[in-house]
Regions:
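Extracytoplasmic and endomembrane cell-envelope/extracellular-matrix remodeling and assembly machinery
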Residues: 59-81, 238-242
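N-terminal targeting pre-sequences for secretion and organelle import
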Residues: 213, 218-242
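Short, solvent-exposed aromatic-acidic interface loops
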Residues: 124-126, 198-201
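Mature exported/compartmentalized surface modules and terminal targeting/interaction regions
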Residues: 8, 13, 56, 238-242
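Bacterial Sec signal peptide processing site at the extreme N-terminus
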Residues: 30-56
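N-terminal secretory signal peptides
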Residues: 1-31
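Short, basic/aromatic beta-hairpin or loop at an interaction surface
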Residues: 203-211
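Gly/Pro-biased beta-strand-loop elements
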Residues: 76-193
């Protein structure tokens, strides 16, 4: 298959050393597989993970060490390629720096200018469909806390331990807001609309039962780094509709 390329994060020294260690371990295991004087026969195994056609995506969606947490790699070979991060021709007509969430297609665009946009696949929860319009990113947060609303706690009493009174759920890999969150305000008031990370890569490109707009953690980190404070955002059910 042929996939478009995009900007990638360089492999960290820690990641390189980890790969080197895995290579050394593989050599050691190969030596252990040999018994006696003749060569050992090892049953071939089918290849695992993405093949070479995924190119830079292997690194783009590889493991990330961030904020004291190790974000695992995304099995990109199990995701529809259209939902992987990529530069596309801008279909929105919006000014550079604008975020557009197209809820009908499960895409988020960040307009780059010069007729191009960065496109991300998103998963949409019920709250992701409940609000539409123009607003701004009021503030951004790395590894945010999560506080379930009272209505959710009423449905799932086990979440009471993360209530506002109890300080919310601390940051971490199991936190529903993931590695980053962007908080959307309209005319100075919180819309309760969020763009946030998620470890649930299999929800990208789908509509799920709860939540706002979720991106893979690797993608929300990329978006967070690109978007300045007060960035304009348009949420619409179709490009060209506002």
């Amino acid at each position: 298959m042929s996939l478009p390329s995009s900007t990638i994060r360089p492999v960290t020294r820690r990641g390189f050393l980890g790969l080197a260690a895995l290579g050394a371990a593989s050599i050691g295991l190969s030596a252990c597989a040999t018994v006696g004087t003749g060569p050992a026969y090892v049953e071939p195994r089918p290849p695992e993970g993405p093949d070479a056609s995924y190119g830079s995506y292997v690194t783009m969606y590889g493991p990330v060490y961030d904020g004291g947490f190790e974000i695992p790699a995304v099995p990109i070979e199990r995701i529809d390629p259209q939902f992987l991060r990529q530069v596309v021709s801008d279909p929105t007509g919006e000014p550079a720096g604008t975020i557009i969430v197209d809820t009908s297609q499960h895409f988020l665009y960040l307009v780059l200018g010069n007729g191009q946009a960065m496109r991300y696949g998103v998963g949409l929860g019920r709250q992701g469909f409940e609000w539409a319009g123009r607003a701004n990113v009021q503030w951004k947060q790395k590894w945010p806390k999560w506080t379930p609303p009272k209505e959710m706690i009423a449905r799932q009493p086990e979440l009471a331990q993360y209530s506002e009174e109890n300080g919310g759920m601390p940051p971490g890999l199991d936190n529903p807001l993931g590695a980053r969150a962007l908080y959307i305000f309209q005319n100075g008031e919180d819309t309760l609309y969020r763009l946030h990370g998620s470890p649930e890569w299999n929800s990208i490109g789908r509509s799920v039962s709860s939540g706002c707009v979720r991106l893979m953690n690797q993608d929300i980190i990329d978006l967070y780094d690109r978007v300045p404070g007060r960035a304009p955002i348009l949420v619409t059910s179709g490009i060209g509709m506002s």
